[in-house]
From Swiss-Prot:
<dbReference type="InterPro" id="IPR020930">
    <property type="entry name" value="Ribosomal_uL5_bac-type"/>
</dbReference>
<keyword id="KW-0689">Ribosomal protein</keyword>
<dbReference type="InterPro" id="IPR020056">
    <property type="entry name" value="Rbsml_bL25/Gln-tRNA_synth_N"/>
</dbReference>
<dbReference type="InterPro" id="IPR001021">
    <property type="entry name" value="Ribosomal_bL25_long"/>
</dbReference>
<dbReference type="Pfam" id="PF14693">
    <property type="entry name" value="Ribosomal_TL5_C"/>
</dbReference>
<comment type="function">
    <text>This is one of the proteins that binds to the 5S RNA in the ribosome where it forms part of the central protuberance.</text>
</comment>
<dbReference type="GO" id="GO:0008097">
    <property type="term" value="F:5S rRNA binding"/>
</dbReference>
<dbReference type="InterPro" id="IPR037121">
    <property type="entry name" value="Ribosomal_bL25_C"/>
</dbReference>
<dbReference type="GO" id="GO:0003735">
    <property type="term" value="F:structural constituent of ribosome"/>
</dbReference>
<dbReference type="InterPro" id="IPR029751">
    <property type="entry name" value="Ribosomal_L25_dom"/>
</dbReference>
<comment type="subunit">
    <text>Part of the 50S ribosomal subunit; part of the 5S rRNA/L5/L18/L25 subcomplex. Contacts the 5S rRNA. Binds to the 5S rRNA independently of L5 and L18.</text>
</comment>
<dbReference type="GO" id="GO:0022625">
    <property type="term" value="C:cytosolic large ribosomal subunit"/>
</dbReference>
<keyword id="KW-0699">rRNA-binding</keyword>
<keyword id="KW-0687">Ribonucleoprotein</keyword>
<comment type="similarity">
    <text>Belongs to the bacterial ribosomal protein bL25 family. CTC subfamily.</text>
</comment>
<dbReference type="InterPro" id="IPR011035">
    <property type="entry name" value="Ribosomal_bL25/Gln-tRNA_synth"/>
</dbReference>
<dbReference type="InterPro" id="IPR020057">
    <property type="entry name" value="Ribosomal_bL25_b-dom"/>
</dbReference>
Length: 182
């Protein structure tokens, strides 16, 4: 398992705002994990560990919550934080089955300088994200689209995107244009 995805946690049995304050006073963050057909679990996570990894998260980052006995595959669903102090008050995680494919929208990251744009063309982005299907741990953070070979008058279609080997397009029409250079 990729170590950057693993987040250590401990279960907690006491709840409420006063208990949450005690947890935060110990430099930990109160959290909950829920999922379809799953019981809600209450956790606490070390602030330093979460904050170190939190800066690198996207909506598609799949984490592994590890309590020493059980590893749970989760997405960060919500983070409650104080904007001024940057103190995280609470985290909601959504648990998914790591062996069941899911569909999720993934951002398209444009890279390279298009030949068509260098020749005076105008780049029009029609789609900023694409729906893909994969196992949770295979879900990419983004899909790269290299614009370097795209000429003036060309367009790039969904079916032209280069996806990782374990990821499939889940859009209804793969002939939709992603970008056009006019």
């Amino acid at each position: 398992m990729e170590n950057s995805r693993v987040l250590s946690c401990q279960y907690r049995s006491s709840f409420g705002s006063s208990n949450a304050r005690r947890i935060r006073a110990k430099s930990e963050i109160p959290a909950v994990v829920y999922g379809q057909g799953k019981d809600v679990s209450h956790l606490r996570i070390k602030s330093s560990e979460f904050n170190k990894k939190f800066a690198k998260f996207t909506d598609n980052t799949v984490l592994i919550l590890d309590d020493g006995k059980l590893e749970r595959c989760v997405f960060v669903k919500d983070v409650a934080e104080n904007i001024a102090s940057k103190l995280i008050y609470h985290i909601d995680f959504y648990e998914v089955d790591r062996n069941v494919e899911l569909e999720k929208y993934v951002p398209i990251k444009l890279i390279g300088a298009s030949i068509g744009v260098k020749e005076g063309g105008i780049l029009t982005v029609l789609k900023e994200q694409v729906k893909v299907r994969s196992l949770p741990l295979d879900l990419p953070e983004f899909i790269e689209l290299d614009l370097t070979p795209v000429n003036k008058g060309d367009s790039v279609l969904l079916k032209d995107l280069v996806l990782p080997s374990n990821v499939r397009l889940a859009e209804n029409d793969e002939n939709l244009e992603v970008v056009i250079i006019k």
